[in-house]
Amino acid sequence: MTYALSLATYATLADVRMELGVNDPIATDDDPVAIKALRDATARIDLELPGKTFFPRVQTRYFHSFADTDGLNLRLHEPLAELTSVTNGDGTALAGSDYTLIPRSGAPYTAVRLQANGATAWQAATDGDPVDALSVAGVWHSTRPFSGMWYTTGETITLASPTTASFTPSNVDGEDAFRRTPRLSEGMLLKATTNGTTEYMEIARIESGVVYLQRGARGTTAVAHTSATLSAWAVDAVIAKACVRLASYYYKRAGHFASVTFNPNTNMGERLPKDLPEDVVSTLDKFKGANSPTFRILDV
């Protein structure tokens, strides 16, 4: 799989401007600094929470036919939001009647269970190699219950070809589904579906009401769209807030490398660098060690 540099961030430029109290839409000179701070903050959150991502990704993942199975069950390494296909080690694409996704109540799915009364069993590859013999294609990501979700932006999008890299929304500064303004901002992950093909796009920048995009993001393929409904991804609210706080901290701390702390043992002040704000540390600590947390993806 080819990976591209991601421009999506766990919070948006508009979020940071609000946190910093920048209300003048004309005051944009420092926006590049704020955007860099957002990308740095997103990267730091990913570093602090290895193995987790709070954006959906379309991907085929591979599993060991022995080590990752327990009888009828294939254990998934990360919660699965939407299933596209399951392929056995012998190359057979399993039919929906061959398996059940666990839990039965719906996503997030943590396992694929073969039917007990069926003739199918998990198999190694045809050469006998069990490593990466099984594959599961779908949409994956980590978040908490009912927190990460797609919502409609109130816009439609027309892109004449897979290489068209910009569009002009009807009202870039209008309200979104949560009555927030602007409805589109740098750092957002967008989604559009045409003729059954879904594409993710990332907002690279917005200039003079024109939205510039990175196409075919997060494992999807760029396609042409005509008046397709445009949705945006709402990052887990707690992670989004941590990103806003950390990005604002990086923004304010630019060029400053130490803080003064009083040491009661020496009665002297000590200049010590403060790595992360305490509220951000507290938030990230709550996500550490949480293996495959329960979540559900919604469209609203």
Locate each region found by the language model:
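Amphipathic alpha-helical segments that form the core helices of the histone-fold
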Residues: 27-49, 268-275
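Autoprocessing Asn-cyclization modules and mimics
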Residues: 76, 83-84, 143-215, 220
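Surface-exposed interaction regions enriched in Ser/Thr/Asp/Glu
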Residues: 2, 104-152, 216-238, 242
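Extracellular/luminal ectodomains and secreted, surface-exposed scaffolds of diverse proteins
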Residues: 31, 63, 77-132, 197-207
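Solvent-exposed, flexible loop/coil segments flanking beta-strands in beta-rich domains
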Residues: 48-70, 158
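Surface-exposed ligand/attachment interfaces on beta-rich extracellular proteins
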Residues: 65-76, 263-267
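Short loop/turn elements at secondary-structure junctions
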Residues: 2-13, 141-151, 233-300
